[in-house]
Amino acid sequence: LKCHNTQLPFIYKTCPEGKNLCFKATLKKFPLKIPIKRGCADNCPKNSALLKYVCCSTDKCN
């Protein structure tokens, strides 16, 4: 699986074994949905008071 791991959409990395999801975190209260954090995960992180996480399982989907 290949996931973006920076705010720039053309930079990505291959996820290590066992990390089979890509995630993207955005600020909940900010009108523009600019990714704050992206990367690989073994399960989808939980939303927090400030961040909303979206997960997916195909190459470069985040």
UniProtKB/Swiss-Prot annotation:
| Species the sequence originates in | Naja kaouthia (Monocled cobra)
Query: Keywords in UniProt for this one?
Result: Disulfide bond, Membrane, Secreted, Target cell membrane, Target membrane, Toxin
Is Secreted set as a keyword in this record? Answer: yes
Q: What else is known?
A: Is classified as a P-type cytotoxin, since a proline residue stands at position 31 (Pro-31 in standard classification).
Give the principal location in a single coarse category. Answer: secreted
Tissues of expression: Expressed by the venom gland.
Q: Does the keyword Membrane apply?
A: yes
Its subcellular locations are:
Secreted; Target cell membrane
Recorded protein name is: Cytotoxin homolog
As for family, the record states: Belongs to the three-finger toxin family. Short-chain subfamily. Orphan group XV sub-subfamily.
Give the signal peptide, or none.
none
Q: Name one GO cellular component term.
A: membrane
Instruction: Output the Gene Ontology terms for molecular function.
Output: toxin activity
Q: What does this protein do?
A: Has low cytotoxic activity.
Q: Which cysteines are joined by disulfide bonds?
A: 3-22, 15-40, 44-55, 56-61
